[in-house]
Amino acid sequence: MPLIYMNIMLAFTISLLGMLVYRSHLMSSLLCLEGMMLSLFIMTTLMTLNTHSLLANIVPITMLVFAACEAAVGLALLVSISNTYGLDYVHNLNLLQC
């Protein structure tokens, strides 16, 4: 396995561990989630380039679009919670339920 794939898998694993460790703060969770999505994007881009598949070229772009939508929704929740409560704790999200 080439070294670049191992580095990207290590970046994904570190982001996943960060997500598990810093799950009480929304900002830290969003940053770790973005790190995971970035490493997945790079991995799918490299796999698409190595397989020379023309039909799979849209997959990394679609993943990037979903990551941007996830970031927008996460930042909107972060702004809403920080304006209401002044904190970015995840347990404040439970108060938004119907």
Swiss-Prot record:
Q: What does this protein do?
A: Core subunit of the mitochondrial membrane respiratory chain NADH dehydrogenase (Complex I) which catalyzes electron transfer from NADH through the respiratory chain, using ubiquinone as an electron acceptor. Part of the enzyme membrane arm which is embedded in the lipid bilayer and involved in proton translocation.
Compartments in which it is found: Mitochondrion inner membrane
Q: How does it assemble?
A: Core subunit of respiratory chain NADH dehydrogenase (Complex I) which is composed of 45 different subunits.
InterPro entries (UniProt xref) = NADH_UbQ_OxRdtase_chain4L/K, NUOK/Mnh_C1-like
Q: Might you report a single GO cellular component term?
A: respiratory chain complex I
What name does the UniProt record give this protein? NADH-ubiquinone oxidoreductase chain 4L
**For this UniProt entry, what is the primary localization, expressed as one broad class?**
mitochondrion
Q: What is its EC number?
A: 7.1.1.2
Q: Name one GO biological process term.
A: ATP synthesis coupled electron transport
